[in-house]
Design a protein with these regions (language model features):
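Small-residue helix/turn framework positions
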Residues: 5-267
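Protein-protein interaction and targeting regions used for scaffolding, dimerization, and localization
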Residues: 242-298
Length: 298
């Protein structure tokens, strides 16, 4: 049940606890300052080892309104293991189930304000916050949305991939985690995504994937627009065919202009600039037409 902080207690202490058990979580080497006053516990630089890494917390837990306890806190995270965070935090299971499929660790910071329920767990649809996470070395497999992207670009190797140096900035509001545009480098492929995920595990992301020359003929399209919808368990990935068609037409047009420029005697340096080629092709065509007319008029 709810731990009600007594209103008539006013004291502070330096905590130094070897092990603390809370729900499914274990906190080791917990130390920092606790200030109890007016039905509220303030936590100052409360450091603890958990989830394979370290967390430093600054914030408060308040039962000033016992029917609506709340927590406001900032967390500094260092080397937290993705899989352990998924296993131990119900919030992660509901809002970021992809953590189950990630191997590696992450660091960063999170700031949250949330009501708490009778089990002292966050009431997620009341949560507001923001933060950023970064990882230097991440591998993943079994993520259905990524599998569908791999199928769309005909590169099955992307289904099991390693990601280097990724940073993710996000906000939490109205039961959704919204991410700012972020880049994922998947081997020779570059994926840029932004969007949100919800408590109901729905996904609403848009993005672009940039293809390398090694992708073969499809790489002539350079960049594909993507949309990821559905849910984590049943994602729906679609490729913007209008974007593909537009880029395909442009690529063919560029090649045609280049060949025409070469036939009209333009050097390779001139054909490197598309706008320049268009202008020079027009000029050359006009010259050819004038020459033809002069010959006919003689």
């Amino acid at each position: 049940g709810i731990f009600e902080v007594p209103r008539n207690i006013d004291f502070q202490m330096d905590a130094n606890l070897k092990e603390v058990l809370f729900d499914k979580m274990v906190f080791n080497n917990m130390n920092g300052k606790l200030i109890v006053k007016d039905g509220k516990v303030d936590m100052k630089n409360l450091s603890m080892n958990t989830m394979g890494g370290n967390v430093v917390m600054n914030g408060y837990y308040s039962t000033a309104n016992v029917k609506k306890p709340e927590m406001k806190a900032g967390f500094k995270l260092s080397n937290i293991v993705f899989a352990q965070a998924y296993k131990e935090l119900d919030m992660i299971q509901k809002m970021a189930p992809i953590f189950e499929n990630l191997k590696g660790n992450f660091s960063g910071s999170i700031n949250v304000l949330t009501d708490l329920d009778a089990t002292m767990s966050p009431v997620l649809d009341t949560m507001q916050g923001d933060g950023s996470l970064s990882t230097r070395d991440l591998s993943l497999s079994g993520v259905k949305a990524i599998d569908q992207i791999a199928d769309a670009v005909k590169q099955p190797s992307l289904k099991e991939m390693k990601v280097k140096d990724m940073t993710l900035e996000f906000t939490i509001k109205d039961g959704r985690v919204e991410t700012k545009p972020f880049d994922i480098k998947m081997g020779d492929y570059n994926l840029n995504l932004s969007g949100s995920t919800g408590l109901d595990q729905t996904i609403d992301y848009t993005g672009k994937i940039k293809l390398p020359a090694s992708a073969g003929n499809i790489s002539k399209l350079m960049t594909l627009d993507l949309k990821i919808g559905g849910s984590f368990t049943s994602p729906k990935v679609s490729v913007d065919t209008k974007s593909m068609a537009s880029q395909a037409v442009e690529a063919v047009a560029d090649e045609a202009i280049s060949k025409l420029g070469q036939k009209l005697g333009l050097d390779s340096a001139a054909t490197a600039n598309k706008d320049s080629v268009k202008q020079k092709v027009t000029e050359k065509a006009a010259e050819k037409a004038l020459d033809f007319l002069k010959k006919k008029l003689k």
